[in-house]
Amino acid sequence: MQIFVTTPSENVFGLEVAADMAYEDLLAFVEMEASVPSKDIILSLNGNPIVDTDPKATIGSLGVTDNSMLLLTTKRVAPNPSTSAQPAIPTLDFSSIQIPGLPAAQRVDPRAEQIRTQILERADSLDQLKLSNPELAEHVHDSQKFSDAFTKLQNELRAKEVERKKELQRLYADPDNEDNQKRIMEIIRQENVEESYQNAMEHHPEMFIRTDMLYINCRINGHDVKAFVDTGAQMTILSEEFCEKVGLSHMLDVKFAGVARGVGSGKILGRVHSVPLQIGSSFFPASVSVIEGDQLQFILGLDMLKRFKANVNLRTNQLEIGEEKATFLGEKDLPDEFGKLGQEKEKKQDHGSAGDAFKDEDIVNLMSLGYSREKVVVALKQTDGDVELAASLLFSQ
């Protein structure tokens, strides 16, 4: 349920709580939100101060219900019960108070709305939010749902902070205990890691943006293909299936058959010594190794890149080779068989095996190159299920 607290400065903030929450935990939440020590807080419900109450009592037993409005005052300004000359706190009914312009069941947190507006004004902020909190990003176009998710997140953070403080209190009560010392060190380590993460997200959010791999448009023997530019691949590679598709199987020299060894091993069927490779309007004679299987199409390897003094120019987003400047393709231009990043890939993974979240067919195809299941799964995880990139990773390492 959601309750609202009014501060002495007439600010209102919402809290997502449960009826069985202890009163002392509610005070801890209010302390974090209002920056007032819990020992100085007095909460009033319907004008009646909640005082001399068992800290362990549930807020439901105290009469707090969904959409309750609590008034926050402090002991420094609260009436002194021992002084009869001071007037009593007037009895006010807050149960009927509503935030103007909004129905009781739908109140938007003004802080959440401010954050949502700022995010919508900056595309990079939305990208960062998608990485750090997908749930908030999902509701960024709906003010009410965003506010609800924001309130839920804030309350979860408060609850974690309350639990952390309680745990530290317990640990420091017996600092000589060896297990307590280990746990304290672990908490400190986690805090340092989290601080480093938050600093990186704040100052270098671009480091968390997924990077597109480098592909260019080209033609092999008159057939269009998206070439994966891989400076980590020693050889230029065609798959067996694609070799047949472009009509080069009859040119395969099986004397060069063998086994490619890297992290694992893959069967090389042979080599086609002269392949008409067209990039832009220029032709480049290429020698390609043909690999067993159908999970690869075409990888432009280091042998070709060095031979033609190619330059991977990330500043201009182009591959400069010979007189040509081929622009690297954006994610939206990649065909499905290359394992597009984002939504398309997630859909593929959703149909994968329950154990590894990858399709059994993809795992079997990669294992046919001579790699163990464990190494194949690791490669798929490293490439987010991208079969093309996983095969390249396994082969080129």
UniProtKB/Swiss-Prot annotation:
The record's SMART domains line, in alphabetical order, gives:
UBA (SM00165)
Q: Do you know which CDD domains this protein is assigned to?
A: RP_DDI (cd05479), UBA_scDdi1_like (cd14309), Ubl_Ddi1_like (cd01796)
Q: Which UniProt keywords apply?
A: Aspartyl protease, Cytoplasm, Hydrolase, Protease, Protein transport, Transport
Where is it mainly found? cytoplasm
Every copy of the Ubiquitin-like domain together lies at 1-79
**Xref: Pfam families:** Asp_protease, UBA
GO molecular-function annotation terms? aspartic-type endopeptidase activity; polyubiquitin modification-dependent protein binding; proteasome regulatory particle binding; protein-macromolecule adaptor activity; SNARE binding; ubiquitin binding
Recorded GO cellular component terms are:
cytoplasm; plasma membrane
PROSITE patterns on file: UBA, UBIQUITIN_2
EC number of the protein:
3.4.23.-
Domain UBA residue range list: 357-397
Q: What is one process in the GO biological process aspect for this record?
A: protein transport to vacuole involved in ubiquitin-dependent protein catabolic process via the multivesicular body sorting pathway
Q: Where is the active site?
A: D230
Q: Where does this one sit in the cell?
A: Cytoplasm
Query: Which InterPro entries does the record associate with it?
Result: DDI1_N (IPR033882), Peptidase_A2_cat (IPR001995), Peptidase_aspartic_DDI1-type (IPR019103), Peptidase_aspartic_dom_sf (IPR021109), UBA (IPR015940), UBA-like_sf (IPR009060), Ubiquitin-like_dom (IPR000626), Ubiquitin-like_domsf (IPR029071)
Subunit details: Binds ubiquitin and polyubiquitinated proteins.
Q: What does this protein do?
A: Probable aspartic protease. May be involved in the regulation of exocytosis. Acts as a linker between the 19S proteasome and polyubiquitinated proteins via UBA domain interactions with ubiquitin for their subsequent degradation. Required for S-phase checkpoint control.
Give the family, as the similarity comment puts it. Belongs to the DDI1 family.
Q: What is this protein called?
A: DNA damage-inducible protein 1
Report the source organism: Yarrowia lipolytica (strain CLIB 122 / E 150)
